[in-house]
Structure formats: C-alpha cells, structure tokens
Amino acid sequence: MTISLARYNFFISLELLKTLVAKGVKYFVLCPGSRSGPLALAAASLSKRKELTLITSIDERSAAFLALGISAASGQVSCVITTSGSAVANLLPAAVEADRSCHPLLFLTADRPLRLKECGANQAVNQQDFLKSVCRHFDESPKEGIHLISKERLTSLVGKSFEMASNIPGPVHINLAYEEPLHPCEIDQNKVLDGWGIEGFLKEKVTPNKVEVFKSFQSLKLPKLDPFSLGIIILGPWRGKVKQLNSFRGALKQWQKLTGWPILADPLSGVENDQEGLINHWDLFFSIGLFEKIKEIQVLRLGPIPPSRELQTWLKKPGKFQLLITEGDCRNLDPIGGSTQFSEGFSCWVDKMLECIPVKPAIDKKIVSQKLTKELIKYDLFINHWLDKRLFRNGLITEPALARLLPRLLPDSIPVMIASSSPIRDWLSYSGEGAFLRRCFGFRGASGIDGTLSMGMGLSIIMGRMVLVTGDLALLHDTNGWLFSKDKNISLIVIMIDNGGGGIFNQLNIDRIKEGDFEEIFLMPQQVCHLTLAKAYGLKYKQVACLDDLEKAIEWSFSLSTNVLIRVCTNSIEDHRLRVNLSDDLKKTLSENLSSFD
C-alpha cells in the first residue's frame, strides 16, 4: 500500500514542532496559508494536547511583532509560522528589530519545492534570502521537500537554530519546502497521531539541551578604568538576556558603591529606582549645558548609546576615555567611534576588575566622583520640583506633562511600553524617577513604529496588565494588532497621544520648505477617528481633555480586565514651543539659583 506524501509531510511537521517544544519553545503564532498546512495541523494537534500555546493571526507583520513582544518579556524563543511568498517578506520589520534589540525569535516558513523554483510558478519566490541579512542563522529542509529529511538532520536543524536564537539572542529563519499533496486526509492524520512513524525516527521523548553561551570573544587584555578617578556611567537600553538582568543590576550597585560615579540611564535600561547615584533628569542637563565644564572624565558605557543628541555631542568632545561594555554582542555598537569595546558582559567585567583593584582610602572617591554626583543630585532635585510647578500649574494636557504625570498614576508593578518618536523622548526628559519605578519596553533597536500595538499585545501575554503609550500614527500603522483582543490572556491599556500626525517632525531642525506643504509631506495627519475604530474592534474607550480626566481614566481602565483605549489630544506645535521654553527657562533659573560645579 502506497502511503500518501501528505502523511509524511504531517509526520515530519509534527516531529519538528515536538522537537522545538522539547527545547523550550512554548508560544507559536500561526498565520494562514495552504503551503504551511502541515505545520498548522501539527501546531493545532499539540495545542489541543496542551503541549504548546497557539495564537493565530491573519497578518504576518503583526504576528511577528506579537511574537517579538512575547520574546522580549519572557526572554524565551517564540515562533512564527507562515506560508510562502510575500508572507515571508512581511516578517522583515520584526526581524530587523529582533536583531538590533537582541530578542530570540524563530521563523518557520513553508516554501515551494525546488521543481517549482525559477520557472514562473505562482508564489515561488526567493524567500530563503528575504531575512538573511538580519538573522543570526538560516537553515532549510531538503529543497526537494521536507519529507526527505532524516531524523538526524531534523534534530541538527532544530538544535542549531534554537542555539543560535538563544545564545546571543536574535532572529533565526528556517525555510521548509513542502511537496504536494500537502493536506493529509483524516485517516492519515489519525495514523500519525496514533503513533505511525517513518523508519529511522526515534520514538523516545526528546529531552531539552542546556544551551551554553557561544563565546567568540578574542582573548584581549581586560580594558580597565580607575574607580578612584573621576567617572560617569551611561546606560543604554538593556540588550542582555532577561535572566541576566538581576546580576547586571547587582554588578551596577557594586561598581557605583565602589566608585561613587553618577549614573545616566535610558528608561529602557532596566535600572531600578533604588539605584544609588541615579540622575533622573540628565537629558535636560545636557540641553542646558551643565556638563560643559567637565573636560576630562572616564565614561563607562553599558549597552547601546541612548538617543540624546546632546549626550552624543558631548561624548564626541576631547577628554572622554570611554569603555563600552555589551552583553555578549560582539558587533560594533559605537556610532561615535571613541570607545574600547568589551563584549563579555558587565557582571564579568566587574568581577575581573575587583580582582585587580588595589585598596585605596575611601577619601579618594569622596573628593573626586562623589562631589560630582552630589552636585548632579542637587540639580536633579531642583529640576524635579521646578518641572512639577511648570507642567502641572494649569491642568492642561501637554506631551511633557503626560510623560511626567502618567508614571505617578500607575501602580509600580505595572510595566510600560513606550512607542518611538515623541513618547520615548518625552519619557526620557520629563518622567523623572517614574521612568525607573517599573520595567519599560520599547523599540530602541531600529526605532521604528512598525508593529507597536502588536508588540504591546505580545508583552501583555507574559507581563499581564500593562500600559502602552503611543502616538496616533504609530497606532494607526498597526491597527491589526487590535485583532489579538480576542485572546483573554492579553490585558493592555493603550494611551494614545493624538497630536494630528507625526508631531516629532515639529521638533526637528527643518528649514522652511520652498515647495510643498510641511504638514502634507512630514506630519501626514490622517482623517481617522480612533474612537470609532476602537468601537469597530469591540473595545472600551475614553477621551481625556485635562490632567484631572487622565487620573479618572486610568482608574477606570484598571477597573477592567480587557483591552482599552484612552485618547489624549495634544497640540504638537504648542508642545514643541513648550519644550524649547522649558529648556531656556530652566537654564536661566539654574544660573540664578544654583552655583555651577567645576
């Protein structure tokens, strides 16, 4: 009796997914398609048996960002399954972000067999090349069809791919060719599910392998800093593994206690509010020139550089001895080009430094770095009170006021995702200690607006009730993310800043346009009512007109367990003027009230 090729396809697909599950992959996001039918049937079978969690999505781009959010929050590999053709191209935006942000993500894409390639066959494209430039690793089944794969090759393919996605976290692409017939009949499905197998495929349960970190670090001399001389610590977005964050925080506390150095941290750095030496409003310090008197200083940079232009300008000036430490990422992460890079992780570096630091009197650091830190904290406290008076005095909602007030209205345990463009910049400048009261997430790899809502949904699957702060265009760009609201495990409060388009462009130094309309070619406001759109998706929503309304809306949103939308209307032109005035007035106020440090 001839066994249908469809049965072989289904069996191999089931074995592949079982092997991934055994490795530790729990979440699978499935997109519709015919060529991927065997994978869909296999995923559904394992989901019914509670062996994996299956989420479905009609939009591959949205699906990939949902999986990205799951990976970002859990630190574990999540998987996206798609059919062939342009479906694979839609994975690229999330793959780019996963690569730059170091999140483990696995793409399983079904493909046409070799006989249908390069001959004009429908939906037969060079999809195997679509994601290669940003993936940690690429692998594929036999080009003639996955039914020809051996047990040893399947085990190797899955093992290597999982390892490459996990070690230095990032995206991995596995392309799987399927020969027809694709869809097994009910008899073939039952046979496979009842234990039928291909000769050579072992039946014992696959055991997860312990993933060892692959180190390609060169044996270079340990780059050192003098803890008893003037220094400063600059933290960019966290790019290490989730499970390494606590040891990173411990090493930071240890190094700061030893040195007394001040800490300038990005909201996405993972630093906690109880960290000694933390300067909350450091971005404003640079905008008003408070650091200009510091000519020579050691700079310990942890991770990618924060987006502050003023900070980057300051770092480019002479007198900065810079050491950049990354969490296993050996790629060049220094756009300034003035640092020595150490890629074995901050905890490792601190341990090695402590072994070779000579004991010196504590008075040294008090004279040098602690003086600087105390001065910065003094300025920080002054700015903190000054901003409260300026931003809350009339009850009007502005984007800076929203960034400052919102963290105070949220429970400390509630995570926040902050969208790119104006929201993350205002959070950096105006949120103060609120930026470090909770874990913050965002796109700081490629800094795009692709998939903002979908990633927030994915984060919520792992983190539970949480908040997304986004602009109107970023939300509109990913409205398919609302389709995930059917998932009862997602509980997202979306606070949308409606400033009539791309308000960030009002903050850029764009000269007067000779021909064309600034609003049309940059701001691009859309004639869409987000509240009507929310209603169409079955969401609950509220409109906020003043700061008092915001507090009531937040209380209302936490009384619910479903996804909700809170619309906050602002004026991007007026808010730009406010930011400029705040900087100018603060500089003048400081010169009148505080003496400058040397």
UniProtKB/Swiss-Prot annotation:
Signal peptide: none
Functional pathway: Quinol/quinone metabolism; 1,4-dihydroxy-2-naphthoate biosynthesis; 1,4-dihydroxy-2-naphthoate from chorismate: step 2/7; Cofactor biosynthesis; phylloquinone biosynthesis
Enzyme class (EC, first level): transferase
A GO MF term: magnesium ion binding
Documented EC number(s): 2.2.1.9
Cofactor dependency: Mg(2+); Mn(2+); thiamine diphosphate
Record key words, sorted: Magnesium, Manganese, Metal-binding, Thiamine pyrophosphate, Transferase
An individual GO BP term: phylloquinone biosynthetic process
Record's keyword annotation contains Metal-binding: yes
Superkingdom of source: Bacteria
Record InterPro entries: MenaQ_synth_MenD, THDP-binding, Thiamin_PyroP_enz_TPP-bd_dom, TPP_enzyme_TPP-bd
CDD domains, per the entry: TPP_PYR_MenD, TPP_SHCHC_synthase
Cofactor binding note of this UniProt entry: Binds 1 thiamine pyrophosphate per subunit.
Recorded catalytic activity of this chain's protein: isochorismate + 2-oxoglutarate + H(+) = 5-enolpyruvoyl-6-hydroxy-2-succinyl-cyclohex-3-ene-1-carboxylate + CO2
Entry similarity comment: Belongs to the TPP enzyme family. MenD subfamily.
Role description: Catalyzes the thiamine diphosphate-dependent decarboxylation of 2-oxoglutarate and the subsequent addition of the resulting succinic semialdehyde-thiamine pyrophosphate anion to isochorismate to yield 2-succinyl-5-enolpyruvyl-6-hydroxy-3-cyclohexene-1-carboxylate (SEPHCHC).
NCBIfam families listed in its UniProt record: menD
Subunit structure: Homodimer.
Protein name: 2-succinyl-5-enolpyruvyl-6-hydroxy-3-cyclohexene-1-carboxylate synthase
